[in-house]
Amino acid sequence: TRLRIALAQINPTVGDLEGNVAKICAAYDRAEAAGCDIVGFPELAITGYPPEDLVLKPGFVADNLSALAQVAARTRHCAAVVGYVAADRDLYNAAAMCVGGEI
């Protein structure tokens, strides 16, 4: 048994959630077409790095979570590990495993 891993060297733009989702999805599609089982994305790929005070804007963290859900919905067999901003009582630099349309 083998495990084929891809590393997506995309260049996310800080604050451009829509553009970053497009970059992530394009790289994901290439990795899956190449037969990869898992593809890793950069730290905070959804928001761009560093998001700094953008995370304090009303709605930005929620929009980042919606963008992550869009990426997850595109996934099939190949898993994607995607960096995003997680929120609980505090904000966290996190990574989500997305596969089969789910986070």
Annotate each predicted stretch with a short phrase.
Residues 1-103:
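Hydrophobic structural segments
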